[in-house]
């Protein structure tokens, strides 16, 4: 399953993401990973979340993030939930690349029985129909 939290800057996406992560950790039977750009969420999330700073691993486009996520899953089959905060800061603000990545996540999640939640700084009205199906 995949959820996309989309809104313009300052619309409360990160607060929704933090609440979702902490709720998931309280109820999940597997590992939870949060990938962010920078180290802003360190004190907002419970210690049981594996927090990853994408800058530390040189992740700056969708191919690197796909490889990183694939490697995480290959190394730990207990990961049930992956959160990505501020997708466009991590992979760049190309809307087509962002859409392609979201669709890849949907397929990867279904194949590997995982859940993805991504926050995207963009206007939800501008999202394609394929992406609108995942908006929360």
PLM features per residue range, with description:
Residues 1-71, 127-129:
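Conserved P-loop
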